[in-house]
């Protein structure tokens, strides 16, 4: 499978929210408006007590045109809007997946690249012209991740940050297999995360 969040971890989180916190499944939305949720994940995370949990991805995400993202740095790119599933939410849980990445370590920060909509449905961050800012390793360099985390609707509503590090892909877009899930760098030294 491609490097999506582990459906077992997502399902466990959802069961905890419904079974222990008493949140109604229909009041829960899992979203990433830059990707597609695989059918197996949606099915696994909406069965039994989770029936009614919503999934919003690039096919059904709706831009809240009253909520454009205001970047603190001026650059050219598409206007970006938060999805209505974010602006209508009372709070967020940021569940990201650990994986190797050519842009360096971002953990939960880059997860919000799945939190905005613009004219490029396939790759909103490219439509926004954001990747250019992630390749620089210099101090005092602008990072759009800071703006996303500081956004009142994103960072301001986030009550929990979680990182799925159970079985991780070695890079973005890589399939997770027995061979690729073993990380070569320290401290893993050819073992699993």
How would you name each of these model-derived features?
Residues 2-193:
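Extended, low-polarity segments enriched in aliphatic/aromatic residues
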């Amino acid at each position: 499978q491609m490097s999506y969040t582990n459906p077992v971890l997502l399902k466990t989180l959802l069961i905890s929210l419904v079974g222990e916190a008493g949140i109604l499944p229909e009041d829960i939305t899992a979203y990433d408006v830059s990707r597609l949720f695989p059918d197996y994940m949606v099915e696994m995370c909406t069965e039994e007590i989770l029936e009614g949990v919503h999934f919003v991805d690039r096919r059904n995400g709706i831009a809240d045109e009253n909520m454009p993202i205001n970047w603190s740095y001026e650059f050219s790119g598409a206007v970006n809007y938060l999805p209505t599933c974010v602006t209508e939410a009372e709070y967020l849980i940021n569940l990201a997946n650990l994986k190797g990445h050519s842009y360096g370590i971002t953990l939960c920060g880059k997860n919000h690249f799945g939190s905005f909509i613009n004219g490029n449905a396939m790759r909103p961050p490219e439509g926004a012209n954001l990747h250019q800012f992630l390749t620089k390793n210099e101090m005092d360099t602008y990072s759009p991740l800071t703006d996303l985390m500081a956004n009142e609707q994103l960072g301001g509503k986030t009550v929990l940050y979680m990182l799925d590090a159970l079985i991780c892909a070695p890079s973005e877009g890589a399939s997770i297999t027995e061979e690729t899930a073993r990380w070569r760098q320290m401290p893993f030294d050819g073992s699993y995360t």
